[in-house]
Each structure stands twice: as C-alpha cells, then as structure tokens.
Amino acid sequence: RLGVHTEYTERGVRLTLTGTPVTRLEEDMVDIPDLAQTFVVTCCLMNIPFRFTGLQSLKIKETDRITALITELHKLGYAVRSEQDSILLWNGERCPAESAPLIATYEDHRMAMAFAPVGLKLPGLVIRNAGVVTKSFPTFWGQLDKLLI
C-alpha cells in the first residue's frame, strides 16, 4: 500500500517501487505496535495522511512513544496528533519546522531507527544518542551505510 514490493532473497531483501502509494493509510496496529514509529515517520515523509489505531501499548514501551513521535515530528514540521491515548493521526497539516532539528531518541532504539530515513530527505539531520540501536540491532548504522553506497 505504500507503493513498495518486498521480496526476500538468499542475499537479503529487495525493495521495488510498484507504483503510486495510497493517498491515505488507516491501520489497526494492535498486533504490530513496534512497527508504528516506522510507519508514522514514513507516511509523513511520503506525505501520506494516516490514522493508526490500537497503539495503547506505545505509552508503556521504552518511552511514551506516542508523545515522543509527536514531539520529534513537530520539529520536522509535521502536525501529528493523538486521540484517546491509542490513536495517532495526521491529516497532512504542516507546522513550522525547526531549521536544524536534533531528533531525541528517548533511550528508545526504535525511535533512532524510525527517524534514520529522514536523513535522506534532510541531509545533516542529527539523531541524538544514535547508539541506542545496539539494544536490538547493533549493526544498524553499518547496514544502513551499505545500503546507501
């Protein structure tokens, strides 16, 4: 639905553009809450309004991921908001972006990984405490570098 086909091969994963992504994404993420941060950031970067429900567990993860996402995306100019402590939504509304945003990770590995692709759109973006990824993916930054070569 985001315009990408994922194929698993012996060497890894191949991502292929398949066409135009959806113009709006609605998803119940109650069974996949750990994907929420990546989906939220990706949708903002792709200018795809969204409404993600089932996110009640995000408030009790490594950090309050709902508040963290809203705070950091506002720095980038995306007016994301929440409802009922379990819904994240964005209607495409923008807000003033910081000129040199520093993305906080809140000691949360998924925050660092979710915001990593933002650096492709905003070269020079700084993600504070980027080493927090070692909790789940110690070679994350090295693997990302290999993809970008």
Which ranges hold each PLM region?
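A short beta-alpha structural unit
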Residues: 25, 53-63, 69, 86-92
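Short, ordered loop/turn segments at secondary-structure junctions
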Residues: 11-12, 55-57, 85-86, 130-132
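Short active-site-adjacent structural elements
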Residues: 61, 90, 97-99, 111-114, ...
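Self-splicing inteins and homing endonuclease
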Residues: 1-31, 76-107, 121-122, 145-149
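Acidic/polar loop patches that form or flank catalytic/metal-binding clefts of enzymes
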Residues: 5-7, 50-53, 127
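A short, acidic, flexible beta-alpha connecting loop/helix-capping segment that sits on the rim
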Residues: 121, 131-135
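Short, small-residue-enriched loops and turns at beta-alpha junctions
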Residues: 5, 58-60, 133-134
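Proline/glycine-anchored alpha-helix kink/cap motifs
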Residues: 31-51, 65-81, 106-125, 140-149
